[in-house]
């Protein structure tokens, strides 16, 4: 229970810390529960999207849904994506890439990358409201599971004391991996039309490409890499689903 609570405390800005004081050690064991947190963050997006979509155009409702998740998560993942893009865009060596990613100032790669990311996301407002709500919940959970596999396949690239959060995640046991997989995949099985199940492959492909990039450049991962992997896996799921729907 402490590990689950730690996951919600780490990945959201909601006052879960008021429920119970969680030992610092528990934050090393949060990775298997990322997809479970996706049920909350994706659920908030879907709820805001659905409710706002009843009284305004889907395009505006979609923007409000995106803002809602930014508020709930404190822009945690977007900050990671910006740092990731700055580091891999501006760094040519392992040491330089890590140094840039740790810099608190955003650079041109981060700014342009975030603009492109949100421009692509905004195109989803063309989808029917009900289907978009389902995609939001499914994509959040599954993409968090895909991103969690970075921890299983790569070592941490920095020393623990150099970590921004002062926490290095533990790798998952087989039963934790299974639980995360089921939690991430369940929305697909329960909500998505069967023709869209193949969309699960797009985040997996994105994960593999990012894994190869991190292994070659850093020989490991950082927290920023995890956030970037989640958002890019999610974006690939949305765009892949859009392609499947159009065709």
Model region roles, listed by residue range:
Residues 1-74, 90-92, 103, 109-247:
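Hydrophobic alpha-helical transmembrane segments
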Residues 79, 90, 99:
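Glycine/small-residue-rich loop that forms an oxyanion/phosphate-binding "nest" at active or ligand-binding sites
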């Amino acid at each position: 229970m402490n590990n689950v609570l730690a996951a919600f405390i780490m990945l959201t800005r909601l006052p879960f810390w008021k429920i119970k004081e969680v030992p610092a050690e528990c934050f090393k064991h949060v990775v298997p529960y990322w997809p479970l947190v996706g049920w909350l963050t994706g659920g908030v997006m879907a709820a805001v999207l659905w409710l706002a979509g009843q009284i305004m155009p889907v395009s505006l409702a979609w923007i409000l849904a995106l803002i809602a998740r930014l508020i709930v998560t404190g822009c945690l993942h977007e900050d990671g994506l910006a740092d990731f893009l700055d580091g891999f865009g501006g760094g040519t060596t392992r040491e330089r890439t890590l140094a840039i990613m740790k810099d608190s100032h955003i650079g041109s790669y981060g700014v342009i990358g975030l603009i492109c990311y949100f421009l692509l996301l905004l195109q989803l407002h063309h989808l029917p409201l009900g289907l978009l709500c389902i995609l939001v919940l499914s994509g959040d959970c599954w993409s968090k599971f895909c991103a969690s596999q970075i921890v299983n396949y790569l070592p941490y690239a920095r020393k623990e004391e150099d970590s921004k959060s002062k926490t290095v995640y533990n790798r998952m046991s087989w039963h934790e991996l299974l639980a995360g997989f089921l939690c991430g995949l369940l929305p697909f099985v329960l909500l998505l039309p069967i023709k869209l199940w193949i969309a699960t492959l797009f985040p997996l492909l994105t994960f593999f490409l990012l894994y190869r990039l991190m292994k070659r450049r850093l020989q490991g991962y950082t927290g920023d890499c995890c956030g970037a992997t989640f958002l890019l896996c999610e974006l690939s799921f949305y765009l892949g689903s859009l392609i499947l729907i159009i065709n």
